[in-house]
Amino acid sequence: MAINESFIGELQHEAATTRKVLERIPAETFDWKPHEKSMSMHRLATHVADMFGWYAPTLEQDELDFANGYEEPKPANTEELVALLDKNVAAAIKCLQKTDDAAFMQNWTLRNGEQIYFTMPKAAVVRSFVMNHIVHHRGQLSVYLRLNDIPVPAIYGPSADEPEM
């Protein structure tokens, strides 16, 4: 199996689960956050949906420099949030489909100007900086749902709200 085929399968599975989480977020909870230092529900959900758009910059470029700036999308409602996810997932699949095994072994660097945070093979970046990062923040988002009495979907197993998978 080619590396891209493995990543596509995982991406599709995680995207479907993420979609279930995002679809449950009512716009009236967008400003809510559990602590003053925490991201708002809207900011965290947008970050999760937006990270599915990180495949192309990771696989088609050799670095990301925060010094160049980045403007995250600002979906106005739940439908736009889910549409952002769907758009990014479709683009990620297209990008993965055209990426060969050799490209996954090329190094990629995350930096902020002269400060280098890390350099690692693109396959490792996709796994850790993109996919594991998405899963981490989706987990936080599921706690946000619980704290707002919004039913939490089954993710890797049953939840208290969805005991059947």
Question: Regions from the language model: what does each represent?
Answer:
Residues 98-113:
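Acidic catalytic patch
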Residues 24-25:
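His/Met- and acidic-residue-enriched segments that coordinate or traffic transition-metal cofactors
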Residues 8-19, 29-71, 111-165:
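Short, contiguous alpha-helical
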Residues 57, 62-101:
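Helix-adjacent hinge/juxtasegments
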Residues 1-9:
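Short, charged, low-complexity loops and linkers
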